[in-house]
């Protein structure tokens, strides 16, 4: 079974509390998602492998560390996942970015995929799938399905808020995928929204309804 971790860093929890509030403006919401994503990126990249490299400083030759192993890719689930991309890129600017577009059928609560645009070498990369919400788990499962169909094998899922139902569904469908979240909330309501949650992340990011 893959790792499941709630990242309880004080700065993340403080910013998440502001993010949840109904009074938080679109501008502030967007900035907070970016900031939390960057902080989470720092945490979820802790186990990236390193290798020795010889470099020359102005004073001497020395052996130091650099990232090794697979190159990185960030794959947001559209549209809300876009809000988390820049936070990750501020840490790993050389990472490539793919996109998986989905919308939720409001009657069945099931995701419908409408776009998959990925780096050609996606099968050779460590992938961070990002989406602010892990609700039913349907979108996350479909996104990982799409990646695995294209040969991807090293995948982590990163969200800001998760429901227990979504975590369980993703773990059952893809037990090899690590899941990271800033909060594990209580449940889903009858409309498939996370409680207490933070509302519709896409609408709040982009000022739409």
Curated annotation (Swiss-Prot):
Its EC number is 2.4.2.9. Coiled coil: none annotated. 5-phospho-alpha-D-ribose 1-diphosphate binds at residues 79, 104, 131-139, 200. It comes from the Bacteria. Belongs to the UPRTase family. PANTHER family: ADENINE PHOSPHORIBOSYLTRANSFERASE (PTHR32315), URACIL PHOSPHORIBOSYLTRANSFERASE, CHLOROPLASTIC (PTHR32315:SF4). Pathway: Pyrimidine metabolism; UMP biosynthesis via salvage pathway; UMP from uracil: step 1/1. Catalyzes the conversion of uracil and 5-phospho-alpha-D-ribose 1-diphosphate (PRPP) to UMP and diphosphate. The keyword Repeat does not apply. It catalyses: UMP + diphosphate = 5-phospho-alpha-D-ribose 1-diphosphate + uracil. GO terms for molecular function: GTP binding; magnesium ion binding; uracil phosphoribosyltransferase activity. Pfam families: UPRTase. SUPFAM superfamilies: PRTase-like. Allosterically activated by GTP. This is Uracil phosphoribosyltransferase. GO terms for biological process: UMP salvage; uracil salvage. It is an enzyme of class 2 (transferase). InterPro entries: PRibTrfase_dom, PRTase-like, Upp_B, UPRTase/APRTase, Ura_phspho_trans. Binds 1 Mg(2+) ion per subunit. The magnesium is bound as Mg-PRPP. Its cofactor is Mg(2+). Keywords: Allosteric enzyme, Glycosyltransferase, GTP-binding, Magnesium, Nucleotide-binding, Transferase. Uracil binds at residues 194, 199-201.
């Amino acid at each position: 079974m893959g790792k499941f971790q709630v990242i309880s860093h004080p700065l993340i929890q403080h910013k998440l509390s502001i993010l949840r509030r109904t009074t938080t403006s679109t501008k502030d919401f967007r900035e907070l998602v970016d900031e939390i994503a960057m902080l989470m990126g720092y945490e979820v990249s802790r186990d990236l492998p390193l290798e020795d490299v010889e470099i020359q400083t102005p004073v001497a030759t020395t052996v130091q560390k650099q990232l090794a192993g697979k190159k990185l890719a960030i794959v947001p689930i559209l549209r809300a996942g876009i809000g988390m991309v820049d936070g990750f890129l501020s840490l790993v600017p050389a990472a490539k970015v793919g996109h998986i577009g989905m919308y939720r059928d409001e009657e069945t609560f099931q995701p419908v995929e409408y776009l998959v645009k990925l780096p050609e070498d996606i099968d050779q990369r460590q992938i961070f799938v990002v989406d602010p919400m892990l609700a039913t788990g349907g979108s996350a499962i479909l996104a990982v399905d799409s990646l695995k169909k294209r040969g991807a094998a090293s995948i982590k899922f990163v969200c800001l808020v998760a429901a227990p139902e979504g975590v369980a569904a993703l773990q059952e469908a893809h037990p090899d995928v690590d899941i990271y979240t800033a909060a594990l909330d209580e449940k889903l309501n009858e409309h498939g929204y996370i409680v207490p949650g933070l509302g519709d992340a896409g609408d709040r990011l982009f000022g739409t309804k």
